[in-house]
Amino acid sequence: MKAVSPVRPSGRKAPSGCGGGELALRCLAEHGHSLGGSAAAAAAAAAARCKAAEAAADEPALCLQCDMNDCYSRLRRLVPTIPPNKKVSKVEILQHVIDYILDLQLALETHPALLRQPPPPAPPHHPAGTCPAAPPRTPLTALNTDPAGAVNKQGDSILCR
């Protein structure tokens, strides 16, 4: 996952610190569809953090820390195995994320629709410089046949890219 943060050339200072309050708001507005109803609160919080970082002398480091803390809080909201009302460290958040990804991978590997398909044949050897044709993919509609199992809340989309 890549963080959704503005990238600026190193050695150049942002016009108004931490990417600027306007830039943080624009960045959040671009991804507002995935923030659900808390878009205004998240935008205000990000702008406040960026304005606080603006006053500090070590601006680039604080901007990076601001971006990283935003991504950790997004991960905390997105991963369902993290207890919502318990303080967890960044390492614990990453451990929960890794476990959640492994659980999702296992669920994909053991999905009944995928088990019914015969294994793909071994790809033939192609000479260097040529690309083999991609194997056909299983349509998502075939995998998502259980509507009761697919619960999609408005705030459940990935924010960091």
Swiss-Prot record:
CDD domains listed in its UniProt record: bHLH_dnHLH_ID4
Subcellular location: Nucleus
Highest taxon, organism lineage: Eukaryota
Record keywords: Nucleus, Repressor, Transcription, Transcription regulation
Ranges of Pro residues composition bias in the record: 117-126
SMART domains assigned to the protein according to its UniProt record, in alphabetical order: HLH (SM00353)
Gene3D superfamilies linked: Helix-loop-helix DNA-binding domain
GO biological process, one term: prostate gland stromal morphogenesis
Region Disordered, annotated ranges: 117-161
One Gene Ontology term of the molecular function aspect: RNA polymerase II-specific DNA-binding transcription factor binding
Summary of subunit composition and partner proteins: Heterodimer with other HLH proteins.
Function: Transcriptional regulator (lacking a basic DNA binding domain) which negatively regulates the basic helix-loop-helix (bHLH) transcription factors by forming heterodimers and inhibiting their DNA binding and transcriptional activity. Implicated in regulating a variety of cellular processes, including cellular growth, senescence, differentiation, apoptosis, angiogenesis, and neoplastic transformation.
Name this protein carries in UniProt: DNA-binding protein inhibitor ID-4
Natural source organism: Homo sapiens
